[in-house]
């Protein structure tokens, strides 16, 4: 009896691993169908008990594998740009720019996951799929990300994604008016404005 139970558990484990792998492969395949796009987005942040923390909106330009311009227009303006090597974060309100190497960006940051769409990143997650919805759970609980969910159509259009942190805070981004077309390279270049403080962490 114990032998059959052990075999059953082994088979179940193998099946589960295969399901996770298939879901991850499907997700990566869908994202690969659209390599550059522009979209508007709305953001809603809620606490663990569901209370509204913040709402916002902005625009997004992306070109895989490593180029993006994430511009938040409300409630406060900020810009996060990757030029392929450096990750620039500009906050006009405090007149500060932070520069870090993109290669040092954590793989458990949802937007970096989407932008890279690299198998080595997805392999760090258990991926479950239900139709166009994909749910990702980190295999390691050492990071701040508890769960990541994304809705991607079969033609590669991202409808929305949600990041849930370890403390239960949830950030949901809904993408609208996505235009799948080439993006001007100028969207992915950044020069710190004169007079701002530069916090250069590329050391």
From Swiss-Prot:
It is found in: Periplasm. Its main location: periplasm. GO terms for biological process: lipoprotein localization to outer membrane; lipoprotein transport. It comes from the Bacteria. It holds the Pfam family LolA. One of its GO terms (cellular component) is outer membrane-bounded periplasmic space. PANTHER family: OUTER-MEMBRANE LIPOPROTEIN CARRIER PROTEIN. Monomer. HAMAP family: LolA. Participates in the translocation of lipoproteins from the inner membrane to the outer membrane. Only forms a complex with a lipoprotein if the residue after the N-terminal Cys is not an aspartate (The Asp acts as a targeting signal to indicate that the lipoprotein should stay in the inner membrane). Belongs to the LolA family. This is Outer-membrane lipoprotein carrier protein. It comes from Pectobacterium carotovorum subsp. carotovorum (strain PC1).
């Amino acid at each position: 009896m114990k032998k059959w139970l052990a075999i059953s558990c082994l088979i179940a484990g193998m099946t589960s691993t295969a399901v996770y792998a298939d879901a991850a492969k499907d997700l990566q395949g869908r994202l690969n169908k659209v390599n550059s796009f522009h979209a508007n987005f709305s953001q809603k942040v809620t606490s663990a008990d569901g209370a509204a923390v913040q709402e916002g909106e902005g625009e997004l330009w992306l070109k895989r594998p490593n180029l993006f311009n994430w511009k938040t227009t409300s409630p406060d303006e900020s810009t996060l740009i990757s030029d392929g090597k450096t990750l620039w974060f500009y906050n006009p309100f405090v007149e500060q720019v932070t520069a870090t190497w993109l290669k040092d960006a954590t793989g458990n940051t949802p937007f970096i996951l989407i932008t890279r769409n690299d198998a080595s990143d997805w392999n760090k997650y258990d991926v479950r799929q239900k139709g166009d919805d994909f749910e990702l759970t980190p295999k390691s609980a050492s990071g701040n990300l508890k769960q990541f969910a994304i809705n991607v159509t079969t033609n590669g259009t991202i409808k929305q994604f949600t990041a849930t942190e370890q403390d239960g805070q949830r950030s949901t981004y809904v993408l609208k008016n996505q235009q799948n077309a080439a993006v001007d390279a100028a969207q992915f270049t950044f020069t710190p404005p004169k007079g701002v403080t530069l916090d250069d962490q590329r050391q």
